[in-house]
Regions:
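Structural motif
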Residues: 16-25, 112-119, 249-253
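Short, hydrophobic/amphipathic alpha-helical patches that form generic packing surfaces
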Residues: 25-34, 121-129, 260
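Extended mid-to-C-terminal alpha-helical interaction segments
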Residues: 191-291
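DNA-contacting interfaces and partner/effector-binding or oligomerization modules
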Residues: 47, 54, 58-202
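Short, Lys/Arg-enriched C-terminal cap helix and immediately downstream tail that follows
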Residues: 295-305
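Gram-positive cell-envelope targeting signals
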Residues: 261, 304-314
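Short helix-coil junctions and helix-kink-helix linkers
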Residues: 44-48, 143-146, 276-281
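N-terminal, positively charged regions that mediate nucleic acid binding
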Residues: 1-42, 46-60
Length: 314
């Protein structure tokens, strides 16, 4: 089961467990607002989810309004249609919501959303009818779609009032209200009753953060290894040059000892090499010796080149 399907199923089951009449009505109102049409003709909701259609049927039935669910085969698959078309049921529906069906613009009636559970119920069925959530392994995104512009504005304000940090835009002529923040997506899922989906998202976020931390550390370690390898190679070349020129044995004992230890352990980091000495030496002290060896080698190379140039000009 996909993450979106899991969340949808949790929300649907929770919607069917509403106890207070005002909350059941708010849930039915959410369906009406986000249905395909809701006017004098009645109400029609089309969905690919049979459970959503059945939830709509049961919620309206609890409000005393009878509707029917039809299966309509389409090339892309079956579409489930919940409809309220019988004149008496249409009259009851509009009486339930205090509407006439002739409204020119649909906006949220705050009188139909009385308590906090009403808000949750309304947002939940809005999600069932016109919402989706992306798998958090890919990205954080939860959105609601509606063709009704004033409804979209009111719905954005409702989400903002409850600090879900919504945004609103238009896509292909449809109003889109979306939430992108991972914390807000988690909260709104839990608020709608998808507690397991919210917890799963939180766990996946923790795993993702751990992976990112490991990747950053690995990249840092790799960069440090590369830096260490380049530094070691530079020092080793300097020591080898001093050996070839017979200059190494003329140096102070501490420098000869440092050179010998580096040649015996060409891959060790400076910190690890310090521990090879008896007694151990400080990192700053050993670093100074290595830089001294490199400087001596460079100075010797420069003097040899100058002497060679003088010989050529004679």
């Amino acid at each position: 089961m996909s993450f979106a399907s899991q969340a949808r199923d949790e929300i649907a089951q929770r919607s069917l467990q509403l106890q207070k009449d005002c909350c059941v009505r708010a849930a039915a109102y959410g369906i009406a607002c986000f249905a395909k049409y809701f006017d004098a003709r009645g109400l029609v909701l089309q969905t690919e989810q049979e459970l959503t259609a059945r939830v709509a049927e049961q919620l309206f039935a609890r409000c005393g309004v009878q509707g029917t669910v039809l299966e309509k085969p389409r090339p892309s698959g079956v579409v489930y249609e919940f409809g309220i078309r019988e004149p008496e049921q249409v009259r009851r529906m509009h009486e339930l919501f205090g509407t006439t069906g002739s409204e020119t613009s649909l906006q949220i009636d705050p009188g139909l959303i009385r308590c906090q559970t009403c808000v949750s119920a309304y947002i939940s069925t809005a999600f069932l009818c016109g919402g989706t959530v992306t798998d958090p392994q890919k990205e954080y995104n939860l959105e609601f779609l509606t063709g009704r512009t004033n409804l979209a504005k009111d719905f954005e304000a409702l989400l903002a009032e409850h600090e879900f940090a919504p945004h609103r835009t238009r896509r292909n002529g449809v109003n889109l209200i979306y939430v992108k923040s991972s914390a807000s997506v988690e909260r709104i899922l839990a608020f709608m009753g998808a507690a397991e989906a919210s917890a799963q998202m939180n766990a996946q976020k923790a795993v993702k953060q751990l992976r990112n931390q490991i990747n950053r550390q690995t990249n840092c370690d790799t960069a440090n290894l590369g830096k260490t390898a380049r530094a070691n190679a530079q020092t080793t070349r300097a020591i080898r040059f001093l050996q070839e020129q017979g200059a190494l044995e003329t140096l102070p004992e501490v420098l000869q000892q440092a050179a010998a230890m580096r040649m015996e352990n060409p891959d060790l980091s400076l910190t690890a090499l310090c521990a090879c000495f008896e007694p151990p030496v400080s990192k700053s002290g050993l670093s100074h010796r290595m830089k001294k060896l490199e400087a001596l080698a460079e100075d010797l190379r420069r003097r040899l080149e100058e002497n060679a140039e003088k010989e050529e000009t004679k």
